[in-house]
């Protein structure tokens, strides 16, 4: 096989779908989905871009140990692996007091432990090739907190720490790790995940009135969100560069300005802005 080999997890929708199709221009892509038989959108988009022959769709549930073990055995046939894009993720929401502990655990199983387990499984095949890359899809939520999204926010903060350590550990092997930190984009993680996994406060909950205001803000923000193709294009750009010089790559409307504000001003200033926007 002449093409380099890339793995993209969570490739049946959102960033993963678009990234898999874009990467197929230059890579042979192993695109994973929990239910490959339902990845019709990926098949159709790949056909539309004439890259169907460069994409292999396979089963992977990043929360299931046996699924990861089976995936690892299958991937060994493609070694060495040149690129791993850890994109699979979901979003649980709600106020901390209202969110069941099981939701926190499930959130971390997908967004943190799933990434760690897949990375550990694939690393032996990545280390065989100097110049390989690992791209972890994080979020602006991995850099700044937001109310009513604590399970998601805390999982992305954990992913940031894992990725930072991973990058340093793999430098001696010529393997570079990067974090992509999108802001608000039109993907199914918000429309599907939060509608299924949001712990909505009861009418008599102390948080009910605040939930309505925050939900209104999130919905308005969603209407102004960006095109997810921007994120897929950034993944492709980093994947095809000779070197990934930085660890973090924030992307999205107003994100860099937000991070600049956070770095220049004290927490109290940021808190005042959030309080005014969300609770006043």
UniProtKB/Swiss-Prot annotation:
Can you tell which superkingdom this protein's organism belongs to? Bacteria
Q: What CDD domains does the database record attribute to this sequence?
A: 17beta-HSD-like_SDR_c (cd05374)
Ranges annotated as spanning the membrane: none
The UniProt record gives the binding positions of substrate as 139
Which keywords label this protein? Oxidoreductase
Q: Where is the active site?
A: 152 (proton acceptor)
InterPro entries in the record: NAD(P)-bd_dom_sf, Sc_DH/Rdtase_CS, SDR_fam, SDR_oxidoreductase
What Enzyme Commission number(s) apply to this enzyme? 1.-.-.-
Q: One MF term in GO for this entry?
A: oxidoreductase activity
Q: Which Gene3D superfamilies match?
A: NAD(P)-binding Rossmann-like Domain
Q: Give binding positions for NADP(+).
A: 3-29
Which family does the record claim for this protein? Belongs to the short-chain dehydrogenases/reductases (SDR) family.
* Protein's recorded name: Uncharacterized oxidoreductase YusZ
Source species of the chain? Bacillus subtilis (strain 168)
Q: What is the lineage of its organism?
A: Bacteria, Bacillati, Bacillota, Bacilli, Bacillales
Q: Which gene encodes it?
A: yusZ
